[in-house]
Amino acid sequence: AESIGKQGQEQTGKPTFTPGNPAVPMNDDTPATFEDGKTTKTVDGVGTYTVEPDGTVTFKPVPSFVGEAPSVTVVREDMNGTKVSAKYTPTVTPVRPTGEEVTSEDIQGKTQTGKPTFTEGDPVVPMDDSVPATFEDGSTTKTIPGEGTYTVAPDGTVTFVPEKSFTGKGTGVTVVRVDKNGTKASAKYTPTVIPVTPTADPAESTGVQGQEQTGKPTFNPGNPEVPMDDSVPAT
């Protein structure tokens, strides 16, 4: 018998046993076993097989396993006690979550956020919200000199605090999350910082010969959210 199931999900199969003669039927009072006489078999890195008295095998794969699993041999006997065996082979198809990149844009000096979208590969294997998101190196904070600092929250939201002098497209970071099987998905977040450039209007003054004069140029912020810094003296 064979069966196919999704990654991380139980599957079952039941080999068919046929009497050698109708006069000597299979003995339903004698439980089926594996060839070693046991009813449970665990294969490291693959999963656990359990056989029911009627010969039905349940296979529970470990969350990370995909592909064709090793076969197990099921043994039954007829009313004469004559044994017969048949193999059961399960196959596990991969379930792969995906990530969709995200961008953000704001003015120079302002904090930005972005949250990549992660989608489960199959509804039966949702994203694991109990496992915090990280960057691809396993960290949750990344500082890029001359650019700024990125921090990722457990839900995958990235906060970018740019250095005051930085403008343009940021390097970005890769966010990693996992599904309930522990399968990873990644997606990039990239911020863009729009320059804010203040302007100045010249000033003029007129006075009589030998007398002191004053004038004050007008300085205008490039954006109302980034006012002129009155704590820094003019030079």
Q: Predicted regions span which residues?
A:
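Extracellular interdomain linkers/hinges and stalk-like, low-complexity segments
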Residues: 1-28, 71, 79-129, 172, ...
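Polar/charged alpha-helical tracts
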Residues: 14, 33-36, 53-54, 115-117, ...
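A surface/secretory-pathway sequence property marking extracellular, secreted
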Residues: 27-41, 45, 127-147, 231-235
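Acidic, turn/loop-rich segments in luminal/extracellular domains of secretory-pathway
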Residues: 39-86, 140-187
